[in-house]
């Protein structure tokens, strides 16, 4: 018999050197996350790019994988997809052949003690001009 889980996480990924590289390519970034979602074991509830240098995500994930392995998968695949879509834009910020996008660290918190509505309102009230079309 399988297990039933309801694991929700607030994940924040920050760009390398905290550069505002996501500014102007927001839709490409959102599309990359949606593409990774299709082939992975998580669901995006909400996502929002802030200041062009970090993205907030609310994810529902399976207990099959560890958080760190899922985050590494997300970071690796989105880096590849965004570079594939926006090489000229990203090469203005990152050079010497290094196809990087995210810093090694990340913030991740479970949402067990907080309702979806509270976290979603927090993310939506970050004054971002460009929101994801969910």
What are these regions (language model features)?
Residues 1-134:
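Basic nucleic-acid-binding interfaces
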